[in-house]
């Protein structure tokens, strides 16, 4: 009997969908925030502009400083709100950090049924924060 239960478990467990849990979603948001903070700090240290690339349809965020990428699972909906123009050029799905620490700002929302998180970049200070989305 125990062998039959083990066999059924081995067959059925891979079929059960593995949705992203709320704690895992929060961990992804913190990971995105740390990537953005790294890009901001690198812009200050190098005295140069650094652009963080955001590809919402592909659920991919890439550091302009290191090339490190955060790829989000298929069940996470990624949406962004960034400035249409940043400085003298179209933003093109990026958040730009300047040598002063300032940025063009933006919000990256990571959501799934039941809630989510926003990673907010302040345009004036370039500071990054993670805020829970209350359903």
PLM features: residue spans?
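N-terminal helix-rich module
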Residues: 7, 11-45, 49-135
